[in-house]
Amino acid sequence: MNYETLASEIRDGVGGQENIISVIHCATRLRFKLRDNTNANADALKNNPGIIMVVESGGQFQVVVGNQVADVYQALLSLDGMARFSDSAAPEEEKKNSLFSGFIDIISSIFTPFVGVMAATGILKGFLALGVATHVISESSGTYKLLFAASDALFYFFPIVLGYTAGKKFGGNPFTTLVIGATLVHPSMIAAFNAMQAPDHSTLHFLGIPITFINYSSSVIPILFASWVSCKLEKPLNRWLHANIRNFFTPLLCIVISVPLTFLLIGPSATWLSQMLAGGYQWLYGLNSLLAGAVMGALWQVCVIFGLHWGFVPLMLNNFSVIGHDTLLPLLVPAVLGQAGATLGVLLRTQDLKRKGIAGSAFSAAIFGITEPAVYGVTLPLRRPFIFGCIGGALGAAVMGYAHTTMYSFGFPSIFSFTQVIPPTGVDSSVWAAVIGTLLAFAFAALTSWSFGVPKDETQPAAADSPAVLAETQANAGAVRDETLFSPLAGEVLLLEQVADRTFASGVMGKGIAIRPTQGRLYAPVDGTVASLFKTHHAIGLASRGGAEVLIHVGIDTVRLDGRYFTPHVRVGDVVRQGDLLLEFDGPAIEAAGYDLTTPIVITNSEDYRGVEPVASGKVDANAPLTQLVC
């Protein structure tokens, strides 16, 4: 995929640079803050093959591009004038969002930059717990201590990391707020807290005011409030101080004022709020944990669709900080794996080649916790699989809620989550409930989506399983070899990236070449078997004797002609020789109907070859050498 081209199209689609305030990215989405969302062309973006979905939520215009989002983001920032939008802080004069939208925007901007690393360290901590539970590793060993420190460092020093990202979001100097966060977890402050636990401790004072020392390691809310206060203080200081001294006097005054204020007022108040929040959640969860599981399992992916899931992140992290574990995060595992199961059901059932390709990559992402490609690319467009995934999530999460399954480290809900629900005391019934609940969600969604989730017209194979096809397929299996493809058409040779359809031009369907035909007769480019013939007759697939899988697509978007102007001369399962007539088409009539006749010839298993090398250029005659396949 050409990320620069896609980035340019996204920039133009959101209304150009003049409409952009800022842009960040998460695991699968570019999150724009725009001056006016109505200036963006959402329909054009949705129709771009490189884009999975467009969502407007939480005061953000979100463009879902999938797992390659980091590459697209870097390509976007590399465009002229775009780098200045990477800072997530929006100018004050821009229009204000609703309170809830603003909250979602703040949370996503603060936590997005390091959420991947946070998930990775959580997974590492889970594997260490599994190793201890199975006696593979001892807690007293040097190996364990080193890896545990790596897995725990980010969470222990949370105030430092959050200080930096919060400072950026609130529009201040992120290094100033980083220092405030570092002060909260400085060894001398932790030592002062430990000393205060002694019955005969002496109280320390700041300018005569007693200091309440609190262990702020792993804390979330105190540094967020402290960073906000510091950034609010920084703006007037920058206005009042002369430019010659502003660079060091502003941070100095922010630190001197904010740090004592945090220890004396902000920290204790925020800690009290954190404890109230954690206690309130525990109380609600305790009312009916089974119902809580069913509700979260059913609705989690709905929250993801609208980008509202970020609102739960502070609650989860606060639970880890205050209680030491969390019962909300494990309920999301069946919700995620439910969508993965639904995607697998579609993958195994559909005969639509494009949907099957999307489902394959989306399934692999979903089992590792990234569900946006599955939801936007597969289950939500078909509706029923999405619903089946949500129902499966509800069933599985209800089982886990009933057993009070608990997670002991943060991470994306995924197949790795099983290691993170192992208690320090070892495997118990709550762990088995996690396994059973997740398998229930996955199996239910997969089976129902396979049975009822795919439209009937997609369940009919494009290529009948005739004896000829089966024999040819078996003969070709594992027999890929060097082969020459001859031109199926007379016309002008084009590079595949010159094709107007990005699905072909991007190479996602495979490597190949294209021809702009001058005659309406399509010939077999190889010896082989007709593996597929679309019911609209505009495209044909061949399985060559050399093992190549060749797709020939006559024209761009010609599927809309519904078979008009195409006359096939072969059927699925026919064995053909190179040069046999496959089909005829009325080129002038197709062009008069407004369609581009450019015909991609793609090797859909091109990954099996070292090279797919054109040997013709310019004008080419039918049945002349066109492409060399090199193993």
Curated annotation (Swiss-Prot):
Pfam families: PTS_EIIA_1 (PF00358), PTS_EIIB (PF00367), PTS_EIIC (PF02378). Its EC number is 2.7.1.-. GO terms for cellular component: plasma membrane. CDD domains: PTS_IIA_glc, PTS_IIB_glc. It comes from the Bacteria. SUPFAM superfamilies: Duplicated hybrid motif (SSF51261), Glucose permease domain IIB (SSF55604). Keywords: Cell inner membrane, Cell membrane, Kinase, Membrane, Phosphotransferase system, Sugar transport, Transferase, Transmembrane, Transmembrane helix, Transport. Residues 1-86 form the PTS EIIB type-1 domain. The phosphoenolpyruvate-dependent sugar phosphotransferase system (sugar PTS), a major carbohydrate active -transport system, catalyzes the phosphorylation of incoming sugar substrates concomitantly with their translocation across the cell membrane. This system is involved in beta-glucoside transport. This is PTS system beta-glucoside-specific EIIBCA component.
